[in-house]
Amino acid sequence: MDEASHLPNGSLKNMEFTPVGFIKSKRNTTQTQVVSPTKVPNANNGDENEGPVKKRQRRSIDDTIDSTRLFSEASQFDDSFPEIKANIPPSPRSGNVDKSRKRNLIDDLKKDVPMSQPLKEQEVREHQMKKERFDRALESKLLGKRHITYANSDISNKELYINEIKSLKHEIKELRKEKNDTLNNYDTLEEETDDLKNRLQALEKELDAKNKIVNSRKVDDHSGCIEEREQMERKLAELERKLKTVKDQVLELENNSDVQSLKLRSKEDELKNLMNELNELKSNAEEKDTQLEFKKNELRKRTNELNELKIKSDEMDLQLKQKQNESKRLKDELNELETKFSENGSQSSAKENELKMLKNKIAELEEEISTKNSQLIAKEGKLASLMAQLTQLESKLNQRDSQLGSREEELKKTNDKLQKDIRIAREETVSKDERIIDLQKKVKQLENDLFVIKKTHSESKTITDNELESKDKLIKILENDLKVAQEKYSKMEKELKEREFNYKISESKLEDEKTTLNEKISNLAAENSQLKNKIEDNSTATHHMKENYEKQLESLRKDIEEYKESAKDSEDKIEELKIRIAENSAKVSEKRSKDIKQKDEQISDLTQNLKLQEDEISSLKSIIDRYKKDFNQLKSEQSNIQHDLNLQILNLENKLIESEDELKSLRDSQKIEIENWKRKYNNLSLENDRLLTEKESASDKEREISILNRKLDEMDKEKWNLQESKEKYKRELQKVITANDRLRREKEELNENSNNIRIMEDKMTRIKKNYLSEITSLQEENRRLEERLILNERRKDNDSTMQLNDIISYYKLKYHSEVRHNNDLKVINDYLNKVLALGTRRLRLDTRKGEHSLNISLPDDDELDRDYYNSHVYTRYHDYEYPLRFNLNRRGPYFERRLSFKTVALLVLACVRMKRIAFYRRSDDNRLRILRDRIESSSGRISW
């Protein structure tokens, strides 16, 4: 540690409180050994060679660190650790912190603090966890209730849809009745028109016959003619009246037939719309069925969760039984200890306190067992009620499913009946145009023939395509084989090339050896020539200097003879070398011949292999050519087939065109006949009009006008009624669409909520596992400590007081470390609870806001205030969109500021405190280790 950690307390009065705590005065952290105050000083520190020092008696029996001093230092009660007492109110200012409130553990430590406080805190924590678990179970129950309400609302919506379907069925029945009435009226009107046409034809025939009779009579008897003329005029007037009435009836019938045909068309359109609506309702019902199945799956999941809770409750029962067994064991141990204490009267106050603590612990465990038993009974009752509710819901769902199935069957039956009625009506309307139907049948037959031909063409095409594909595959296989053979051929060529290359290299090496030998021979020949030149030069010199150098000549002759001998030797050597070269060349030639023979054999083998491969390739090529020929033949056959099919198609198309021309000609002839009849009818009507213009009265016209006006009013009323029904259907459609959207949104929200709940459950299970592991570790540690206590009590020696002080100091250190750890866990737990509460609150806000936007009524158990539905409060939890950062205006709350010295100083201070805490933690661990080793050494056991 440096000097920064030795700051006095007075210099930090005006500084703010941080989560790490306030700085305290540093304890003595010198690395020198702690000398016991009772140790006798050594007089012979410098004399190492002298004998061992005489043992002297200590002033006190205790040779350890004073246990009361151990816990009076700052490391045990530092302000950085969370305080145990929660009832002290926080100070408003950090500078005026009361010193008595900084350390609230010292007073408890000076008193006789019971040894089982960590276990108590652990039990309190378990109780809190159980409470939280119970709260979450209630929340899950509420969510289940909401799911059930949503399911009930879906079922009610389904019932509404079923009622709408019933009303639509009733309307369809009424429309069917109206349709049948209109069809019957139409048939009666057609019969009346046919009767009237027959009457007209009979009257025309009578007129023609009477005209012939009048023309054939003689003009002699004028009186008879006049009478006959009068009679004829009367008959004509009667006939004209009849014609007029018939004409009016025909016009009325035509108008009625047009109106009824329009009504029929409109009602057919309405029927189609109703059928579409029925299909939509069926699809909606299927969607609702899927939703119901999804909710059934959710209910099954909930039942599985309930079963898991049952299993957990059984596990808790087992744990309770284990705790009961532990409590019995502790009671037995207590009784044994009490008997021992009664035997050994001299017992310390500390052990009595321990006994009291054990008794208190046993009482608390028994209370916990009783509370847990009551909780288990209550939970079992709740589970039974939930299971009963689940069975009721499942029975209701099954009933609703059966009802829906029966209603769907009824709808299907009605739909089939409607379709049958529509088919019958269409068949009745189609039966009037027999010629057109016959022609259409012919066209259909031709189309069927065309279709059959196309089918056969497509089948033959598919067969040929398959054959072509198979042959293509064979060609590909053969091509692959060709490629493999070519690769083998290329490999063989490569090997041949490599061998040729090696042969060339060997030849080049032999040529190099030849050149080196020739160079040696040439060098020897040059030396010989040089010697000969020298001899010639010497001979020339001797001729010039015979007289002066006779002695030299003799010497030179001797030298020449020596040189001759050397030359002979060199020539002999050259000959020997030539012989060797010849022998070597013979050997090399033999080797070469052998190599050449081997290579020739290899080349012959390779050529044979190549020939075989070429034969295979040629055979493969022939097979490929054959397949290609077959392929071309098939292609030509296919082209011929296609040509034939095209010709057939053209013939059929020509036939179709001819049949269409026949149809057109028939229709034209029918139109011409109809126009001729119309012309005749118009001529007759014009004649009748001319005859009856004088006799027509205004009253008849007024009556006709009034009748037509009434009919128009009735048609307008029917039109308005139809428009109103159309608007009703549109409204109902919009309602169905909105309900579908709402259900889809609710489904998405429920999925999101279920995912969030699963995440929270996973977190809770992790926290629970951690707490359970900590509890088990603490229980094991407590058991080990109790075993050690029992062992230490059995071994009572002269140094029992010293050992007891060591044990007390060790357990006090252990206790305070556990207190600090528990306080840290409390802080973490509070933080996690706050985070969970905020998360759940946020989820509730989102769900409430969604329900508010969908206009869904709130349930009765709404625990949130109305302030949380405010948009301002809702935006509080979202990221704020900060404005632009201007250089001039930096005083706003959302603009960047410069870092103040205060924040930096607080950060540095927190780092220093964390360093100090880490140092104190290490020193405490060292103390614990030293004390544990001392206790084990004193008890006679050494753990290596």
Curated annotation (Swiss-Prot):
Modified positions (Phosphoserine) in chain numbering: S60, S80, S529
Classification via Pfam families: Spc110_C
Main location: nucleus
UniProt-recorded name of the protein: Spindle pole body component 110
Superkingdom of origin organism: Eukaryota
Phosphothreonine sites (modified residues): T18, T64, T68
Keywords: Coiled coil, Cytoplasm, Cytoskeleton, Nucleus, Phosphoprotein
Region (Disordered): 23-110
Oligomeric form and interacting partners: Homodimer. Component of the SPC110 complex containing at least CMD1, SPC29 and SCP110. Interacts with SPC97 and SPC98.
